[in-house]
């Protein structure tokens, strides 16, 4: 879930303009056009796939799912595979923007985690369109030393770290960020208030708005991407992040030889569990190649390498034993059964409710 473009496995991540230009110029059909977050793939996955199949991958990146939705709904996206959060998919399925998976071309489908498959039924019954990729939770990443220096008795493990003005104000000077994602932050605010985190009722949204406005003076930035740099650099000490990102941020601190110790917790009050999947657009020019790539990802050794690089739990049960022990045993990435009981799935909101949520978020970000 990254913004900066970079080279992965010798393959260039290109801009949308370059993608459109390439599509206009045509290709031999020996191509796969993939739309994904930056750094949300194994370090050598694309190169390994090209070596194994001879199919060249054009990897285009985005920094928000809203962009993906817009491209799909306008048609002629030019992509063969796109990454999406499962909660966003039901209205897109209804709009007919995807083509169904041909399971005959996916003989390794049985490798998928049965619990993940079960969790996804509410978004896409029978997983007619969804190819499971990764899953995770939302939580709090913090700089251990900076938090301890400012508040030795800080309520580590609680959403009060972010949502109690008397507490979060203690950390404002060392940098506090929230995701720029209303469907992540507002449910957590509601959960902290003891309300239904999936609610979009006007009274509940108003309560969440008031809570968030109360801590707004202490939030340095709304950011879903750059904390991967600001946390390991020491520019931010407390951030709402996705689960795997804390491990990536810590690894970057180690690589930069910075004496920064980061930690992560899934709030005791509960948090979101999310699922990212791959989808084939209705107008995909190389649907057969898309199926070949999905089948490649269904190989345990392939997905284990992906998790080892991006630090997110994958949806391939057969790959778990091949994941590095330090990642596989990290409770932030692979939470135990008791912790998973505290996690709740995201709700697919109606367009009307999403407009209300967006209005609340705009008010919170501007501070009035």
Predicted regions and their residues:
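Early extracytoplasmic/lumenal segment of secretory-pathway proteins
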Residues: 23-92
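Mature extracytoplasmic/periplasmic domains
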Residues: 281-342
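Periplasmic-binding protein-like
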Residues: 205-214, 220, 258-279
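Short beta-strand->loop
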Residues: 99-110, 160, 256-272, 281-284
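A ligand-binding cleft/hinge motif common to bilobed small-molecule-binding domains
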Residues: 88-91, 238-259
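A bilobed periplasmic-binding-protein/Venus flytrap-type ligand-binding module shared by bacterial periplasmic
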Residues: 141-146, 191-192, 274-286, 305
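Extracytoplasmic ligand-binding site segments that recognize negatively charged/polar headgroups
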Residues: 83-85, 89-218, 225-232
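Conserved C-terminal helix/tail region of periplasmic/extracytoplasmic solute-binding proteins
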Residues: 229, 337-368
